[in-house]
């Protein structure tokens, strides 16, 4: 009989393990799933140990990655293999894979997003070819296996956790970290937050219709123009709302109208396609402002950041999202709301709202 996995392995930004653990405990309880988190501070990951009668695959499907806020990656996993002998790390790994009955098309070796674990790169490189060769011979690594992927999550030279991911419910980047290149002409590094948000929230095949050069957008709290830069690069006409100065090159594009007004008060002259906002303020005040825009409605889609408190961050995020969803529901507005702690976020989360009517 095959050995069944009963752990859920999730990656996160180091320092946010407690927040991810709180989110998982809350959401599994609502889903009627039993279990508990194991997380060390600044470790960059959380192990959620499920009840013995609860298959990890069931929870993984019930709470997909796109429904989670603080997770970068979501995997079905076995408990870690520990105290691996330095002269033979492969045997225990291969034995567990064979016992699981797993088959897969690719193998990823990963570490937490910390400087200490990144030193394991040499070990992973040395193991890659012999690991692939052995698993091919044992019939686990195949050309066709439903797109499944084996993950080896190394947290020490003698400690690795084996996990599996499935297409459509995983991040397609090593460590769950997208590799975006900072455009030198952008006015600030914040530009990468909006670019990453589009990759996460808007399917690439929908970009021609939802991020097109025929659109109009508002950027609240725009200066110096990091987010406006992304809108302009897509060909949009942008109302940049901020009392601060905008980047000269952006203004020279002819696609930006800079208005020195309060982003919480300004109203657009017509319904726009996009609202984006990276204003540093109390999260609930930002929610109230976005709610007004969506109820009016002054936009079709919105992406905005919520700055988080130092403690009980999941409680604050949950409260804000519930408030927004409830307000839109009471107004009879159908919308899809998603939220993610992006790689390029720090002490904030990014929210996307798409009106469905």
UniProtKB/Swiss-Prot annotation:
EC top class, as a word: transferase
Cellular compartment(s): Cytoplasm
Keywords: Cytoplasm, Methyltransferase, rRNA processing, S-adenosyl-L-methionine, Transferase
One GO BP annotation of this record: methylation
Binding site for S-adenosyl-L-methionine: 190, 223-226, 242, 262, 278
GO terms for MF: S-adenosylmethionine-dependent methyltransferase activity
Catalytic residues (UniProt): 307 (proton acceptor)
EC number: 2.1.1.186
Pfam families hit by this protein: FtsJ, RlmM_FDX, RLMM_N
GO terms under cellular component: cytoplasm
Catalytic activity: cytidine(2498) in 23S rRNA + S-adenosyl-L-methionine = 2'-O-methylcytidine(2498) in 23S rRNA + S-adenosyl-L-homocysteine + H(+)
InterPro entries: RlmM_FDX, RlmM_THUMP-like, RNA_MeTrfase_FtsJ_dom, rRNA_MeTrfase_M, SAM-dependent_MTases_sf
NCBIfam families for the chain: PRK11760.1
Role summary: Catalyzes the 2'-O-methylation at nucleotide C2498 in 23S rRNA.
Quaternary structure (record): Monomer.
PANTHER family associated with the record: RIBOSOMAL RNA LARGE SUBUNIT METHYLTRANSFERASE M, RIBOSOMAL RNA METHYLTRANSFERASE FTSJ DOMAIN-CONTAINING PROTEIN
Family assignment from sequence similarity: Belongs to the class I-like SAM-binding methyltransferase superfamily. RNA methyltransferase RlmE family. RlmM subfamily.
UniProt xrefs under HAMAP family: 23SrRNA_methyltr_M
Protein name: Ribosomal RNA large subunit methyltransferase M
Record gene name: rlmM
